Structure formats: structure tokens, C-alpha cells
Amino acid sequence: MKEVQIEAGWKKVLQEEFDKFYFEKLTDFVREEYRQSPIYPPARFIFRAFDTCPFDRVKVVILGQDPYHEPGQAEGLAFSVPTGIPIPPSLRNICEEIRTDTGQPAHIDGGSLLPWVEQGVLLLNATLTVRASQAGSHQGHGWETFTDAAIEALAKRREHLVFLLWGSYARRKSAMIDPRRHLILEAPHPSPLSAHRGFFGCKHFSRTNAYLRQHGIAPIVW
């Protein structure tokens, strides 16, 4: 993981995690995985969610579970794919909800969500790496501990953030977040398997912006 860098603000709040034994073991595991197998995202993008959205600039957190595990899709940002790559079904459903909620098409670049990131949307997967074609293959090796620490740091050190928790896995993270200090919005996952059970019609994008405006924070152009 020599290629990995992390933004200075995040480095400061997560320094204790880097020094813990679990992170040392995680580093050894991930380094060996990259040596032996095709792993996604490319190593230089492992911490891209943090690098592209500095700690002090986060306004909204969208939690994913795993990076995409097929060639060319994962770029270190939850739900996002590089421009030119076909848009995955969950992201298509997210775009559809934005259109019906806001009355505008999604402000994204193909399937890349960098235009959101640049406005302060942290696109964080709970597990930051995955073996090619093996969903969930890097779960349970320490990434979840690390990304939980990131969520807790935001929840405790910042205020008036919006946490968008889609699906049962993400919704479990609500226990770490004080609802008196932040807005927590929960819905089923935007996957085709569950989007019709309440993701469609959740209006999370307009509700996020209403909350941000209420607290004097510039809204997101979704």
C-alpha cells in the first residue's frame, strides 16, 4: 500500500487507527492480495474517497458496502464509476430518484460522481478493496473498523452533516451518529432488488438540501 496517500485533515483524525495492530495486519493482508490477484480499485485509489473530500469540507456522507468488483468499474468512490463505463443498475436508480425528487437530471459526469464529491459529498465504502469478481472478499479483515472510525470522527467532531444510509448494512451505522447533531436519512438500497420497496420516493436529495439550507450551508447540486 505504498502508493496510498490520505488527505491531511483525515490523516490527523485517523492517525490513531494507522498506529493500531489491526491496521498493520490489514496493510499486510491488502499488500499481499495486490501482489497475488487482480484487486479493485487500483491501489492508488484505495483512499480516494478521503483524498477527494477533505474532512473539514464534508457536508453529506453516502455509505456503500464494497467496491465494484468487475474490470474498470471501481474508482475508490462508493456507487461511482469512471466516465465512459456503463452506469450500474443501482446508480441508474439513484439518478432516477434524483430526477423525480428534484425535477432535474443528475449532475454527474457519465457515471462519475466526482461533481458531487467536489461539493462535499463523501462517497465511502465500508470495505475499501475487493478481489476481482468476488463480492465481499475483503470483508472482515479490518476495513470496517477503519471506516467506522471515520464515520465516528465525523459524527463527533463535525455538526449538521447529512448521512444517507441505504440498505440494511448502511442503516446499522446509524447507532454511531447523534440525530440531535446530524440528519440521518434511511431507505432501502437502490439496487433493482429493493429500490421499489422505498428507495424510490424517499426524496433524500431534496430533504438533504432543505436541511443544509436550514443550517446556512450551501446545498448540493445533485
UniProtKB/Swiss-Prot annotation:
**Catalysed reaction per UniProt?**
Hydrolyzes single-stranded DNA or mismatched double-stranded DNA and polynucleotides, releasing free uracil
CDD domains attached here? Answer: UDG-F1-like
Q: What is this protein called?
A: Uracil-DNA glycosylase
This enzyme's EC code(s): 3.2.2.27
Protein's organism? Porphyromonas gingivalis (strain ATCC 33277 / DSM 20709 / CIP 103683 / JCM 12257 / NCTC 11834 / 2561)
Taken from the UniProt entry, a GO cellular component term is:
cytoplasm
Places the protein is found: Cytoplasm
The active site consists of D66 (proton acceptor)
Tell me the PANTHER family matching this sequence. Answer: URACIL-DNA GLYCOSYLASE
Gene name as annotated = ung
Q: Which GO terms describe its biological process?
A: base-excision repair, AP site formation via deaminated base removal
Please give the family membership noted in the entry: Belongs to the uracil-DNA glycosylase (UDG) superfamily. UNG family.
Which cysteine residues pair off into disulfide bonds?
A: none
Q: Please list the GO terms describing molecular function.
A: uracil DNA N-glycosylase activity
Q: Which UniProt keywords apply?
A: Cytoplasm, DNA damage, DNA repair, Hydrolase
Q: What is this protein's function per UniProt?
A: Excises uracil residues from the DNA which can arise as a result of misincorporation of dUMP residues by DNA polymerase or due to deamination of cytosine.
Q: Which InterPro entries match?
A: UDG_fam1, Ura-DNA_Glyclase_AS, Uracil-DNA_glycosylase-like, Uracil-DNA_glycosylase-like_sf
Primary location class: cytoplasm
